[in-house]
């Protein structure tokens, strides 16, 4: 066996249908497009969502909501995630160093979700009232 004698298995490489190349091919003349009409022409399909002149669904339904630009630079952190940070003082640089928030984040809010397992000092972060109570109950403190 040599590299120049290798061939694909029989039937492994199926030839593409050559449309519009004579009647003997079985796909000649109309090439499977039928007679006349928009869909028989080159580039002749109506745009996506077109409903034959009826007002399309995407225009009948009202616009709803928006994408908040605040979400690009603000983040929320749960209490159980904070317990995994090794630093005693938790601030924005400590969270970025622990890869809990991305580098583009500018403000972080600590929310009361999960359990606080150790006493930590939180500095320079927004904290909800419930989260503050849980942190102080665990022996930690909050500085704004």
From Swiss-Prot:
The keyword Nuclease does not apply. It holds the Pfam family Ribosomal_L27A. Keywords: Ribonucleoprotein, Ribosomal protein, RNA-binding, rRNA-binding. Residues 1-54 are annotated as: Disordered. GO terms for cellular component: cytosolic large ribosomal subunit. Residues 22-31 have a biased composition (Gly residues). The keyword rRNA-binding applies. GO terms for biological process: translation. Transmembrane segments: none annotated. GO terms for molecular function: rRNA binding; structural constituent of ribosome. HAMAP family: Ribosomal_uL15. Belongs to the universal ribosomal protein uL15 family. Part of the 50S ribosomal subunit. Binds to the 23S rRNA. PANTHER family: 50S RIBOSOMAL PROTEIN L15, LARGE RIBOSOMAL SUBUNIT PROTEIN UL15M. This is Large ribosomal subunit protein uL15. The gene is rplO.
């Amino acid at each position: 066996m040599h590299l120049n004698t290798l061939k694909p298995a029989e039937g492994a490489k199926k030839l593409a249908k050559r449309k519009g190349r004579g009647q003997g091919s079985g796909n000649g003349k109309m090439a499977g497009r039928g007679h006349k009409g928009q869909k028989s022409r080159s580039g002749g399909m109506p745009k996506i969502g077109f409903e034959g002149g009826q007002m399309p669904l995407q225009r009948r339904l009202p616009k709803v909501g928006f994408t908040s630009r605040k979400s690009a630079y603000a983040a929320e952190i749960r209490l159980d995630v904070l317990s995994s940070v090794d630093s005693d003082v938790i601030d924005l640089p400590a969270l970025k160093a622990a890869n809990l928030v991305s580098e583009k984040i500018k403000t972080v809010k600590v929310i009361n979700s999960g359990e606080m397992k150790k006493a930590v000092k939180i500095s320079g972060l927004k904290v909800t009232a419930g989260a503050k109570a849980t942190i102080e109950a665990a022996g930690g403190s909050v500085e704004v």
